[in-house]
Amino acid sequence: MISFLLCLAILIGGYFVYGKIVDNTFGPDDRETPAVRINDGVDYVVMPQWKLFLVQLLNIAGLGPIFGALQGALWGPVVFLWITFGTIFAGGVHDYFSGMMSERNDGGSIAEITGKYLGPVMQNVMRVFSVVLLIMVGTVFAVGPAGLIVTLCKNSGMSGVLTTTLFWLIIILVYYFIATFISIDAVIGKIYPIFGICLIIMAVGVIFGIFTNPAYTIPEIWQHFGSMHPSGTPIWSFMFITVACGAISGFHSTQSPLMARCMKSEKQGHFVFYGAMVCEGIIALIWAAAGCSLYEITGGLNTGLAAALAEGQSAAIYDVCSKTMGGVGIALAMIGVVVCPITSGDTAFRSARLTLADWFKIDQDSYANRLKLCIPVLGVGAFLGIGNALGFINYTVIWRYFSWTNQTLAMIVLWAASMYLFQEKKNYWITAVPATFMSAVSSTYFILAPECLGSLLNSKTAEGATIYNTAVAYPVGVIFAIAMLVLFLHATKKRTAKNA
């Protein structure tokens, strides 16, 4: 428990100390923000700071810090360290700069920002990459909740159309269309703060339940400083990829511009962007602690948690909430596993619309122009979702690549932020260091993961267990990270010479 409390204190302190260093490095000022200057009543709408924070939290969180943290807890309390320091030095920095760079560039989408600082080739790569990723995220966060609602209806004794996935999927997609089309403060700005509060209450309830029940003990890092993963999966770099939103996530960079278009002052960025990421880190820390403390440990391995997750991630959330909070926890769990994915799905589609609008220079202040983009974006999402529900499309294999693409996106955004800081003659090491680190994480995972090159390089034991080829992956990951840093420094020298 001491480890947990120390990490919690470091996270909170990190917001006030390192978060302020990050904020001062960027240098917010009193210039007119896009929300005030453009204010189209649709995407550029001034919102109060507390609402900006809660909407940003729900946009970037959803179920990410819950699912990812529970999966990360399979490695044991060592995951506390990554959640804590990853949030402070990588995730918070990433979210802050993706939001503030957007704010300085008329609320532009992350693809446009990346192109400005890393060049037109990377801009086009990011445009395609972002739209595909966002539609995929939105679709998955429609199919998943639809299936969960069907399960709830069946368990409640209902029958007929209410117990069909297709019915609920259509309902969710209709809501997505409305939320993507109308003004951001009409639906998202009104209901998101409520669900953001629910997400926080659920996390507080979980940790309170653990603290007040003597049967549960949060293990200490120094007692289990190593992998407790039942399958023997290496900590590096699988844990760093798996935790994802609980420490750093490239998906956040697609969401931060939404709030960058709604800020009244640049000085709100520290609280809205860095603060929301720290809050998400705290939520992830709590759920990781739950995963480490509520389940049986056999032979120093988290076998109990592995069994719980094998029943399904939603089932694991339900189990944690019921054990720590009883009936109230069950109600909160249902809100969490159904509503939170939906609130990530609708903003994913909205971000896809805005990315396309920035790409093709289509103003979004008229209904007709929004329809031009909403129809194809939601149309593709509906095709994938309904196709999956009817069984003739299966993108499960494609979704496995999300973990890697998510952190690769974070890596690219951090390099873009580094170039921005260089051009502004500011301390670019504050972003270049985490960019280098994430370059190593992403490249190492690409070589080791079975869905990537691991299927070619790894081997199996006689019992079928995977032997990961770390002898190749680890050095290659380090070399790639160093190469990226060298390329960045070379680019800065070329730009310096050009401007001389």
Region roles according to the model:
Residues 47-64, 207-215, 224-287, 332-344:
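Hydrophobic, membrane-embedded alpha-helices of multi-pass small-molecule transporters
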Residues 10-11, 15, 56, 90-106, ...:
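Helix-loop-helix module between adjacent transmembrane segments
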Residues 138-156, 167-168, 180, 199-226, ...:
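Hydrophobic alpha-helical segments and their helix-loop junctions in multi-pass secondary transporters
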Residues 99, 210-221, 275-319, 389-393:
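Extracellular/periplasmic helix-exit of transmembrane alpha-helices
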Residues 10-66, 268:
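Membrane-interface "cap" regions at the ends of multi-pass membrane proteins
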Residues 123-127, 162-170, 275-284, 292, ...:
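Loop-to-transmembrane helix boundary motifs in multi-pass membrane proteins
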Residues 7-17, 130, 134-138, 196-214, ...:
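Selective recognition of specific alpha-helical transmembrane segments in multi-pass small-molecule
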